[in-house]
Amino acid sequence: MNRAFSRKKDKTWMHTPEALSKHFIPYNAKFLGSTEVEQPKGTEVVRDAVRKLKFARHIKKSEGQKIPKVELQISIYGVKILEPKTKEVQHNCQLHRISFCADDKTDKRIFTFICKDSESNKHLCYVFDSEKCAEEITLTIGQAFDLAYRKFLESGGKDVETRKQIAGLQKRIQDLETENMELKNKVQDLENQLRITQVSAPPAGSMTPKSPSTDIFDMIPFSPISHQSSMPTRNGTQPPPVPSRSTEIKRDLFGAEPFDPFNCGAADFPPDIQSKLDEMQEGFKMGLTLEGTVFCLDPLDSRC
């Protein structure tokens, strides 16, 4: 029987939710390495990976090489693998990418987890050697996944929706900035044309045009028709035509479509952001297998 969350009755969590959600739990271990596996879950899968990396460790040990020590930082956001002294992050395994985690029952020092690589999308099995904390580290990763899973259920997917809204607004801002730059270039071109027209001298013997009348604010009354007809020409070329009114109805003062919060439609997200959101949701749906226990993204009261 699989439940949304279940664990063996003799296993209890040892950390407070605040420790994993607001901070992290550190552990020290030796890093045997990582190797690609064909499946995201399975005892046989990790057993073969452990055997392969143990053999590689013995070869390195016979050559005088030491197994590197690492620090693990476990939280609801994932498992970070750092160099203990410099704190340089070597690997950052996000929780929704971790699908299997177990400690070796035949070797109490060994624990392992399978994580999907963010760049290659291959499943990698990470193997560690911890003298006293192998089982505790495995349970801590399971607790972190459980807390992240419950946080997702409580939010009702609002976190994902919030990220989508932010992505949509960021795209809207980027589009407006692009439009603004294009409009600036158009204004600059019009100013250059106007400057060239103004500096051109009138033909010899021509009469000085009569100054138009002004209003009470000492300004020339605006008339689209008279303005267009009074625009001088140079070398027989006409100034750029004034856009018709029909093309301006759906544009604001700056040439952009007016923003309507009630008619903006569904956001069109950039492919990279959308794929990350879909991948995160799919990772939680797959769940985390912990010592034969499955955490899956189902309603809390469901039964499979």
UniProtKB/Swiss-Prot annotation:
Its main location: cytoplasm. May function as an adapter protein. Required for efficient phagocytosis of apoptotic cells. Modulates cellular glycosphingolipid and cholesterol transport. May play a role in the internalization and endosomal trafficking of various LRP1 ligands, such as PSAP. Increases cellular levels of GTP-bound ARF6. CDD domains: bZIP, PTB_CED-6. The modification Phosphothreonine is found at residue 16. The lineage of its organism: Eukaryota, Metazoa, Chordata, Craniata, Vertebrata. This is PTB domain-containing engulfment adapter protein 1. It is found in: Cytoplasm. Residues 225-237 have a biased composition (Polar residues). GO terms for cellular component: cytoplasm. The gene is GULP1. It comes from Homo sapiens (Human). Keywords: Apoptosis, Coiled coil, Cytoplasm, Lipid transport, Phagocytosis, Phosphoprotein, Transport. Pfam families: PID. InterPro entries: Adapter_Engulfment-Domain (IPR051133), PH-like_dom_sf (IPR011993), PTB/PI_dom (IPR006020). Residues 223-246 are annotated as: Disordered. Widely expressed. Detected in macrophages, pancreas, kidney, skeletal muscle, heart, colon, intestine, lung, placenta and ovary. Residues 158-202 form a coiled coil. Residues 21-176 form the PID domain. SMART domains: PTB. GO terms for biological process: apoptotic process; lipid transport; phagocytosis, engulfment. Belongs to the ced-6 family. The modification Phosphoserine is found at residue 223. Homodimer. Interacts with clathrin. Interacts with GDP-bound ARF6, but not with GTP-bound ARF6. Part of a complex composed of GULP1, ACAP1 and ARF6. Interacts with ACAP1, LRP1, MEGF10 and STAB2.
